[in-house]
Amino acid sequence: MRRTQRFFLNGAVNALSSLLLRGIGMGFSVYLARRICADGIGLFSLVMSVYSLAVTFAASGINLGTTRIVAEEYGNCNLPAARRALKSALCYAAFFGSLACVLLYCLSPLLGQRWLCDARTVPALRLLAFSLPPLAFSNVCSGYFTAKRHAYKNALFGILSECVRIAFAVALLLLPHFHGMQGACLALAAASTAAESICAVFCVFLLIFELKRETRSSPKMCSRGVTRRLLRVSLPIALTAYVRAALLTVEHILIPLGLRRSGAQASAALAAYGTVHGMVLPVILFPLSFLSAFAALLVPELAEYHVRGDKEAIRRLCSRSCTVTLWFSFGVCGIFLSFSVGLGTVLYDSKSAGQYLYSLALLVPLMYFDHIVDAMLKGLDEQFASMRYNIIDAALCVAAVWLLLPRFGIAAYLWILIGSELFNLSLSASRLFRVVKISFQPMRLLVLPILCCAGALGITRFLMRRLDAFFSYEGWALFAHIGASFVLYFALMRLCGCIRREDVDWALHLFFPQRGKKNPQNASPQAAPSGSTESKKLNRQIIT
């Protein structure tokens, strides 16, 4: 199987699994919104803001470190060095995961009562502490399988973890001991801990099986310096991640406090916070499943190109990734602008959720493009620049939340989110464009997609109004309308020349590799020698 096809196949597996996981997760958030209401979701979101800081400390950058070092060693066909890196990563995860568990368990009363100002969060934090060691091991296994392009294994583990979490949560919420907001938070924490533990056990078993299979035919090569290289990648990422996670935790703690200082009641402040973070943002992040799957695979792919010094392959892959991301994000942004109220009503039976979704629709192109740019920077060994930008962005967000929320309320926070993404993206994209010479075409990447999206939404809205006897903006009809708009959007892009023939041929060639062989343009009257410069150029063109 060709390299590009393998990359696309792994990305498709990741995309489908990520789509399934986000769909299940969004359905579960809908269930929680109806079960424990917005203020209950807000309380658990506060718990998760502190837990995310503990998760950052438990992982300590080991996922990316494992992916980079293992991918580089497999690219050099040095299997013993890859296994040495894996063993070092497991020891690293055991240390930081155990330390994070002890710290979170012991500091839970202080964090819950002093930081979150709510004693109901303490039992949930203590229970979540036991999920940190298995989570750290799962990060190592995930990084290893990502480096080996075994996307389906990470997909299976993700689906298993999500299904276990939801099954435990639903079962516990039905018991009388877990009624009320504190009981609901405790049930969700227990479900997350059980899911992480079960998933880690399966990950380790599969990892052992994988290592035994490789040992049969692996040559013995030098593996010195692997642990030092792993620490060189992981520790700086960990240190910067600590700072950013701490700033994000402070930001999330300040949001309900700022809303209360603006005049809102405590329950109303938790409800507004829960609506934005527990309802609206999952909807915005749901389409990102398609891109995040390929973004995860960009890291090892670009890492191998970077080690070999193949600048042309890096430029082509980055250019195509940016193009597809912008096209997709503009379509999703238009969907949210047009159907925000309907989505809020159908999913959550909440008009306020629809209004927040409309206000944050402009966040979609910024967030999606920033996500793919960050992945490319990590693959090109520019992760420190990316983390530096994230820290600056998080610090500015904390200051803005502290200063603006008490005066302007929740509207200020929505604008802070948009401004934060714009600032972060401008720094990250400028860094990427300095490292990789990508040709930017504003008409093809910005103007035409926006016009085609507006045209597609206008046409489908006009047609649906003529067929209002058969269609409405409720239930499945709403999603049919959204699907028709998206299909028409890409059709208009093709008609306007935004999507070119070469793009269509490239996509079809991924599914039908024989198609390129039958094309007479790909054949040469006189085949060049296999070692010649012309042959290498031809092979490189066919691969991309």
PLM feature spans:
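C-terminal transmembrane helix end/exit motif
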Residues: 171-177, 194-220, 252, 374, ...
